[in-house]
Design a protein with these regions (language model features):
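Alpha-helical transmembrane segments of integral membrane proteins
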Residues: 1-20, 274-277, 307-344, 356-476
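Bacterial inner-membrane juxtamembrane interface segments
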Residues: 17-38, 53-68, 82, 86, ...
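Mid-to-C-terminal secondary-structure elements
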Residues: 117-129, 143-283, 481-538
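Generic structural signal for small/hydrophobic residues in well-ordered secondary structure
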Residues: 12, 22, 43, 59, ...
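Hydrophobic alpha-helical membrane-associated segments
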Residues: 28-35, 292-298, 345-353, 389-394, ...
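Membrane-proximal extracellular/periplasmic loop immediately following the first transmembrane helix
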Residues: 37-99, 209-221, 234-236, 257-268, ...
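N-terminal membrane-entry
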Residues: 276-295, 377-378, 382
Length: 538
């Protein structure tokens, strides 16, 4: 093998122009493929680190007419836990309002915080640095923090049992410290406080009664027992809403079903329209994977065409090798060695291109990759597979063609390419131009669509409009006073409040025309609450 590589190196060095063109083409193809491999591997790895990942499901509220929600009525999870033996664990989660900020050295700091039931860490697997996952959320005013939060407020000291003050007067006992939440998790938080804290803050008010069927503001995850037949369970729980609260829902012209969404589907295949965590689309994964395949094919076809175009230059070499006793298999191995060596050299050049391209790629894909990301075992393994595939695709056909020359034909100068070979090369060239044209056309189409969206009338004047998130205003603050204070500024012409951004729904619901209660008259609606100045302000 070493001898093959030495001869391959000499041949590549001898034909420098050919080598540089192929090297650059393969390097560009491999760099694109490695970047997309990094992206696809990362996308498909989300939520895979949980020990019980295959048994974790998220509850969905299914609207038969569309607009499924990942938030549920409060009693649903309790009923599932108590009445369905297939369900091993149930957990409630809910976003903590921004007003519940950390008070530290006279300043307020807002963090991404959630309420969670005491079984949260029995369902999800997060690495504990301090504390016991089984009891960390079992009492009111317990809080679990990430390593970054601990370092920010306490440095390197042990913090288990220490007090963290929120909203000026609420004292929380630190019951656990966990590693920072991995990027490969759809659940992202910095602090997690017990759900019993929420019950204390609402004076022990229970939403598990009749009123809870109208409160769709809690997210639930369930852990199923091993061996559970999920389709059968879904069929059993589908009608839970209508069975338990049908009268009320019919009166409100609503119809909901209970659905289950596997943890593995939440990020890429979610059926929810109001997701709170990072979400993407499996279609984007397929799209970029297709681009990687096409770019690699272009590089390989370019290599094949250039190599076979030089067949006349290598024919004498092949003839002489056969005269001195080399077999066709040996000659094929020599040409495959050249393809392998060129691919490996292209990989090193491609690695430089990848390093230089990472900032742009991160900006384009909304990621935060660095060189260390390329050292993941899956990326290394995938890259080795890519090298093998490129070597086979680009080297095998030229090796077969070139090793097929007969010494007698070479000595006589009869080195004619068969009609089949000519047809194949022409087909490869046509395919190469077709793929290139398709990618260019797709690029211009996307640019055209983006320009079209940017130029469309939004229905309001977005210039000189500033949006402030006033959910951070303490609960006892006067919004009227705040509005008046802003209005007094000389640079402010008009002020308005709403519960959502322009163009985004604040709420979703179903409405019916008066005196026509019934599903056939229901209208799915997205709506928002605004004040009397809203239209004039926009």
């Amino acid at each position: 093998i070493l001898n093959y590589l030495k001869i391959a190196y000499r041949n590549l060095k001898r034909f420098k122009g050919y080598t540089y063109i192929n090297l650059l083409g393969l390097a560009l193809g491999l760099s694109v493929a490695v970047l997309i491999l990094l992206f696809v591997t990362d996308e498909l790895a989300l939520d895979k680190f949980h020990k019980n990942k295959d048994r974790i499901y998220r509850l969905l509220t299914i609207n038969p007419t569309g607009g499924n929600m990942e938030t549920n009525a409060w009693p649903v999870a309790t009923i599932l836990k108590n009445e369905y033996p297939e369900v091993e664990q149930v957990v409630y989660t809910r976003k903590v309002p921004p007003s519940l900020m950390v008070c530290y050295e006279g300043k307020d700091y807002e963090h991404n915080t959630y309420y969670a039931g005491e079984d949260f860490f029995q369902i999800f697997t997060f690495n504990f640095l301090e504390g016991n996952p089984e009891t960390a959320l079992s009492k009111p005013y317990q809080i679990v923090i990430t390593r970054d939060i601990k370092d920010k407020y306490f440095g390197s000291e042990v913090v288990l049992g220490k007090i963290l003050t929120l909203r000026d007067t609420l004292e929380f006992e630190i019951s656990g410290v966990i590693d920072n939440i991995p990027d490969r998790s759809h659940i992202q938080f910095e602090m997690l406080t017990s759900f019993k804290t929420y019950e204390q803050l609402t004076d022990g008010f229970s939403y598990n009664g009749e009123v809870g069927w109208g409160m769709f503001n809690v997210r639930n995850y369930i852990l199923l027992n091993e061996g559970t037949n999920v389709p059968q369970l879904e069929a059993k729980i589908k009608g839970l809403y209508m069975d338990r609260a049908g009268d009320w829902l019919n009166e409100m012209c609503m119809e909901f079903h209970v659905g289950l969404e596997p943890l593995s589907d939440i990020y890429l295949r979610s059926k929810s329209s109001n997701g709170f965590g990072p979400q993407a689309s499996i279609s984007r994964v397929y799209l970029v994977s297709g681009i990687a395949i096409f770019v690699l094919l272009l590089a390989c076809i370019n290599f094949i065409n250039l190599t076979t175009a030089r067949s006349a230059y290598r024919a004498k070499e092949v003839g002489l090798r056969k005269i001195v006793g080399s077999s066709r298999r040996t000659i094929m191995a020599q040409f495959m060695s050249e393809a392998l060596l060129l691919t490996i050299l292209a990989l090193f050049l491609g690695a430089i291109i990848v390093d230089l391209s990472l900032p742009f790629f991160n900006s384009l894909m909304g990621k935060n990759y660095d060189v260390g990301s390329l050292l993941d075992i899956k990326i290394i393994g995938g890259t080795i597979v890519l090298v093998a595939i490129v070597t086979l695709l680009s080297g095998y056909y030229p090796a077969v063609v070139l090793s097929g020359y007969q010494p007698v034909d070479v000595l006589k100068g009869n080195m004619h390419t068969s009609a089949k070979g000519v047809t194949l090369r022409r087909a490869l060239v046509v395919f190469q131009f077709f793929i290139s044209g398709t990618l260019v056309l797709a690029t211009f189409t996307v640019i055209s669509q983006l320009n079209f969206m940017r130029s469309q009338n939004l229905g309001f004047d977005k210039d000189q409009v500033l949006i402030l998130d006033v959910t951070r205003v303490p609960n006892n603050a006067s919004y009227d006073a705040f509005q008046n204070a802003i209005s007094q500024l000389s640079t402010v012409e008009s002020v308005s409040f709403s519960n959502a951004l322009p163009g985004r729904p604040g709420w979703q619901g179903q409405w019916a025309y008066p005196d026509t209660i019934g599903a056939e008259f229901q209208v799915d609606t997205e709506y928002m609450a605004v004040d009397e100045h809203y239209i004039a302000t926009l």
